[in-house]
Amino acid sequence: MRIADKTVTRAILERHGFTFKKSFGQNFLTDTNILQKIVDTAEIDKGVNVIEIGPGIGALTEFLAENAAEVMAFEIDDRLIPILADTLARFDNVQVVNQDILKADLQTQIQAFKNPDLPIKVVANLPYYITTPILMHLIEGKIPFAEFVVMMQREVADRISAMPNTKAYGSLSIAVQYYMTAKVSFIVPRTVFVPAPNVDSAILKMVRRDQPVVSVQDEDFFFRVSKVAFVHRRKTLWNNLTSHFGKSEDTKAKLEKALEIAKIKPSIRGEALSIPDFASLADALKEVGI
């Protein structure tokens, strides 16, 4: 029987006297069909290494280890380490690292793979409260992970994968899609977790682009401008720009000029701008001396 089988999960938790900690956002998946779908979505085979974040008691790790060359699982909760040693004992291609992924030296850690030159995919069931910081840390980090298949709160998955002119579209959509393609693969109902969370989850598949989707003069400034445009979603782009950059006559003249160069109407809202539009705007703002 699988670790994810509800009776097995309960038995493991009872045997080790494990209690859930809200501070870690722990929700363990107990549906083997969904676990298999995650592995299939990630296209895991013996030609790839996997970094897993938040293995819990090893339900997904079991499926990954059966299919991948190697799995390196990062678990922050000390109490789960002996449980994982028990549940994953039959595998010789799994390393469990008791560390916060945000603090890990991944450049060094991945050298512990037997074949560190294999492509590395990131597969994770991320705690809702820290999904965005972990994702951006890995996407923007020094290691160009080729692919991410991540379970997260459905609302966050919708925001990351959103297109312009939708309610979900915002600076997070732009921050991720600048580097990656992003698509919701399927929805995971809250009922298949122990304990059950308050909302449904989604599996989001992100694949790194060969190069960023647009070329910009200053990446940091580009992301700053995209954030400014969504500070007040109901306000026009002009109102958000003047609120952030200033309302002096000189500044307003520069903003008008930049919008003219970028061929963007000041009366539209940020959600109407595509990533190329934001790139044009950021470069134009630089050009006029903002």
From Swiss-Prot:
It is an enzyme of class 2 (transferase). The keyword Heme does not apply. GO terms for cellular component: cytosol. It catalyses: adenosine(1518)/adenosine(1519) in 16S rRNA + 4 S-adenosyl-L-methionine = N(6)-dimethyladenosine(1518)/N(6)-dimethyladenosine(1519) in 16S rRNA + 4 S-adenosyl-L-homocysteine + 4 H(+). GO terms for molecular function: 16S rRNA (adenine(1518)-N(6)/adenine(1519)-N(6))-dimethyltransferase activity; RNA binding. PANTHER family: DIMETHYLADENOSINE TRANSFERASE (PTHR11727), DIMETHYLADENOSINE TRANSFERASE-RELATED (PTHR11727:SF7). This is Ribosomal RNA small subunit methyltransferase A. It comes from Streptococcus agalactiae serotype III (strain NEM316).
